[in-house]
């Protein structure tokens, strides 16, 4: 049995992860048990999760919300932690075997490092961890003998395809698929007046607001490009991206003999979540089966980097290296937050990300503080640019 510490339990990935746990337990197999839960501030849902799954410990990032939760669960046998210290405590919890980090944003970096240093198996859904601090994270994983299990559907697909690989030298390239988001096929002029409600209408996936906006700008694919470089030790020149509107082929790998292997499935995040939680074993899934006969065709297109500028900015950022990817990530988080508040336009997100990718200095990363400072500087730049 794996004892799970779930960080981000009230978010999109977290709630779907708990659906997976319910399904596994319903099948009568105690493969996964919830030992710890963490959330930002949604204590109403977190309290319900505590009463259902009976974890030994929980953490709430928001300090005031943590105090409210303590009062609400006085009758429960559960330890309540708070703040960043609380997240890191849960990530390194002695009772946990595996940590699923599904928190959104840079707040996920320090808990990721805490889990690795505690030698916990790590299922990683927090994209920003690898984008901003990839070198630190992979070094910590290597030093502590931890294999990182990807939860993103694209990286899970690659991870699954690689299971039959004999040696790394056999691998020629990886090919990430992108849905293209809600604005596929539109030009920049057609996107000048886009509102948050428009950008939040994803054609295939059920995701949180921030990730859905990233999908609309193709920033998510730029982020996943950087993730793939770190997770699979790839030269960026050997990573390709294609737009695949149906979201049935989740990613592909090409071997040096030009054989191409793909992982397919319906677009449902519970598939990669479950594989990460139960790896290397597989269990029955709550997700419906894929019927290829239902699809008359599967389509593939080159990404439009002229319209969706965030994607190219991420490629330039990883090419420059150092703290630039962390700065780009920070700029995007800040710009997306402003867009969701309707304080800037959709095109302004790409403008901010590109400016940071091309002008911010590439400082060497020696510690977490270097990453956090690059993130802070980029956010300050966006605030100054748009909120004067």
What are the functions of these language-model segments?
Residues 1-388:
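Catalytic, metal-anchored helix/loop core of enzyme active sites in primary metabolism
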């Amino acid at each position: 049995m794996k004892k799970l510490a779930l960080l981000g339990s009230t978010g999109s990935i977290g709630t779907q992860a708990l659906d997976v746990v319910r399904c596994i337990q319903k099948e009568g197999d105690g493969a996964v048990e919830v030992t710890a839960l963490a959330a930002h501030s949604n204590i109403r849902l977190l309290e319900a999760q505590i009463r259902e799954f009976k974890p030994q410990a929980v953490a709430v990032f928001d300090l005031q919300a943590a105090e409210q939760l303590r009062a609400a669960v006085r009758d429960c046998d559960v330890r309540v932690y708070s703040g960043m210290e609380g997240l890191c405590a849960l990530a390194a919890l002695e009772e946990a075997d595996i940590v699923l980090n599904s928190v959104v944003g840079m707040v996920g970096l320090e808990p990721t490092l805490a889990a690795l240093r505690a030698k916990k198996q790590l299922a990683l859904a927090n994209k920003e961890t690898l984008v901003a601090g990839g070198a630190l994270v992979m070094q910590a994983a290597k030093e502590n003998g931890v294999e990182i299990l990807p939860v993103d559907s694209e990286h899970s697909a690659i991870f699954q395809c690689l299971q039959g690989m004999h040696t790394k030298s056999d691998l020629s390239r990886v090919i990430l698929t992108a849905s293209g988001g809600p604005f596929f096929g539109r030009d920049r002029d057609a996107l000048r007046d886009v509102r948050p409600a428009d950008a939040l209408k994803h054609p295939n996936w059920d995701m949180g607001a921030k990730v859905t906006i990233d999908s609309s700008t193709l920033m998510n694919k730029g982020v996943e490009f950087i993730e793939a470089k770190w997770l699979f030790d790839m030269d960026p020149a050997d990573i390709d991206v294609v737009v695949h509107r149906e979201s049935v082929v989740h990613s592909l790998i090409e071997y040096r003999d030009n054989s191409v292997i793909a992982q397919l499935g319906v677009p449902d995040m519970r598939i990669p979540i479950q594989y990460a939680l139960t790896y290397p074993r597989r269990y029955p899934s709550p997700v419906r089966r894929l019927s290829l006969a239902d699809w008359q065709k599967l389509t593939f297109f080159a990404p439009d980097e002229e319209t969706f500028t965030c994607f190219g900015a991420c490629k330039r950022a990883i090419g420059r290296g150092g703290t630039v990817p962390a700065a780009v990530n920070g700029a995007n988080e800040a710009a997306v937050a402003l867009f969701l508040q309707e304080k800037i336009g959709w095109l302004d997100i790409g403008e901010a990300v590109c400016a940071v990718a091309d002008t911010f200095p590439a400082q060497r990363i020696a510690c977490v503080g270097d990453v956090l400072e690059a993130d802070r500087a980029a956010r300050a730049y966006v605030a100054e640019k748009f909120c004067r």
